[in-house]
Amino acid sequence: MSAFVEFQHVNKVYHTGEVDIQALNDVNFEINKGEFCVIVGASGAGKTTILNILGGMDSLTDGKVFLDGEEVSAYNKRKLTGYRRYDVGFVFQFYNLVQNLTALENVELAAQICKDPLDAAEVLAEVGLKDRMANFPAQLSGGEQQRVAIARALAKNPKLLLCDEPTGALDYNTGKAVLKLLQDTCRNKGKTVVVITHNQALTAMADRVITVK
């Protein structure tokens, strides 16, 4: 069985003036469908570059990237836009919620652009916010706002959930609860979840750990 996510000899070089910065050097890894994968490494090691390439937000210099048998790295701009919209859900360290929309409206907004969205209210209930749907972001704690952001990503019903330091702005216990939520999502919904972090302690929760040096 071929891997669900595959990086083959991926290189990324950023050109800044006369200086070339090698962000990724011959990166190879596989992630199977339904795995909870944690990518760890020091700041500047290239973790976010990997996530941006996998999420279709950045291009590689050479190599190949596959998702579900499709060579994402060969997509043109139009196909990449569709890929980001339909196939990938994103969760970032900062929640990026629309402040004048309720929790429910924030999730519904994301669901509107998708082919096969999940019910926004049901997803919010699943992440523990059944009683907070009518609240605005300013009325929610950091952990609750991150749960709205996770619900927003899940409501798209993506093939892949990408999380960049999702607990970075949260205290330890809140962060742990958010990670447990991501892990449960992976288990219960069969989603493939990739979490980028510098926190080695999170590796204990993972099905697969990828260390970037």
Each predicted region: which residue ranges?
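ABC family nucleotide-binding domain
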Residues: 4-7, 11-212
